[in-house]
């Protein structure tokens, strides 16, 4: 019975693909929760991916700007990137085998392709308190809530008998407090930029810059999985990029800091650092499993420690200038 259902399901998808894309599917294999691998008799395989309503606008926007370093979906018979099927939006894109490129090389290349995406799509926009207040109020509420939960958890440890394990967590907590202090300092600087109505470049950001979202095809490099992309500030892409690849042995000073500090404004670098710490704090999963909490605090401590190591020169320079 199950085999019959699977066969019927395949036939439905096969008809959908052939009718809308003139592609004859020989098989349809689960690839991820959102994608299926389409195997064809021609040897040119494809990915079928469920997506969002506004993806078509994103690909049209990038195509109109002439972006050539992204993998575009195949056009259907109606000359659209996205097709409706059973109340779901789908697109089909060429499938390429993952290349055996070392992570250090892929990290450098991914940053380069993100920079190309940003440069092609940038346009100036003035920061305004009215447009920025809601975003910062929301981020501040999220941080305040998480710091409150962390403080309550630490107090619960301190009120009980202190053990070697609880001391381990307590010894890591001070770095989280350092991050809190740094977030407040950076937020004040960013708010000053906003109050000054500073003009900054907005770009199309990938918004999910992982190494697996960079493909190598016959010597060329392409970005994929731009479904969550949006117009924003490049600092967000670079913050997610840094957090995702912080443990890879590459020169962060060369590939990120110099890029952000070469701009006319400190806003990009400040916002990048703010977002990195924001991600670190938000991802701490507070739960009732004591040994899991030891792991959570260890991970947070190591990440924040590395943050201050990577960005300490800039921070010290700023503080010294303020003293002078």
Segments the model singles out, each with a brief description of its role:
Residues 181-184, 298-324:
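Charge-rich, low-complexity terminal tails
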Residues 1-4, 9, 58, 66, ...:
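Gram-positive cell-envelope targeting signals
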Residues 129-204, 310:
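ATP-dependent phospho-/nucleotidyl transfer catalytic cores
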Residues 1-25:
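Juxta-kinase regulatory segment immediately upstream of eukaryotic protein kinase catalytic domains
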Residues 234-265, 276-310:
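Active-site activation/catalytic loop segments of kinase-like enzymes and analogous catalytic loops
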Residues 88-102, 151-156, 280-299:
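A glycine-centered beta->alpha junction motif in the catalytic cores
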Residues 35-39, 73, 184-236:
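Active-site acidic catalytic loop and adjacent metal/ATP-binding pocket
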Residues 41-129:
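ATP-binding pocket architecture of kinase catalytic cores
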């Amino acid at each position: 019975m199950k085999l019959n259902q699977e066969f019927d399901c395949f036939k439905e998808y096969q008809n959908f693909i052939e009718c809308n894309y003139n592609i004859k599917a020989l098989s349809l294999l689960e690839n991820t929760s959102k994608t299926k691998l389409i195997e064809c008799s021609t040897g040119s395989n494809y990915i079928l991916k469920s997506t969002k309503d506004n993806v078509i606008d994103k690909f049209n926007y990038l195509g109109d700007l002439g972006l050539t370093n992204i993998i575009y979906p195949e056009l259907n018979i109606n000359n659209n990137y996205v097709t409706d099927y059973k109340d779901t939006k789908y697109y089909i894109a060429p499938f390429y085998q993952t290349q055996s490129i070392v992570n250090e090389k892929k990290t450098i290349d991914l940053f380069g392709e993100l920079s190309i995406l940003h440069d092609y799509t940038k346009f100036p926009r003035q920061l305004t308190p009215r447009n920025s207040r809601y975003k910062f109020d929301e981020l501040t509420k999220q941080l305040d809530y998480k710091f409150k939960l962390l403080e309550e958890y630490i107090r619960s440890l301190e009120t009980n008998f202190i053990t070697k394990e609880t001391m381990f967590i307590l010894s890591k907590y001070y770095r989280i407090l350092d991050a809190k202090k740094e977030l407040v300092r950076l937020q004040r600087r960013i708010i000053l930029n906003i109050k000054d109505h500073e003009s900054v470049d907005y770009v199309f950001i990938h918004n999910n810059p992982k190494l697996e979202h960079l493909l190598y095809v016959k010597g060329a490099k392409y970005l994929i999985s731009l479904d969550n992309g949006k117009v924003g500030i490049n600092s967000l892409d670079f913050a997610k990029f840094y957090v995702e690849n912080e443990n890879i042995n590459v020169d962060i000073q060369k590939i990120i800091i110099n890029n952000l500090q070469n701009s006319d404004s400190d806003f990009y670098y400040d916002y990048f650092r703010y977002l990195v710490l924001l991600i670190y704090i938000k991802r701490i999963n507070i739960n009732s499993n004591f040994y899991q909490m030891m792991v959570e605090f260890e991970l947070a401590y190591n990440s924040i420690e590395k943050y201050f190591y990577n960005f300490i020169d800039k921070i010290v320079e700023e503080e010294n200038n303020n003293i002078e």
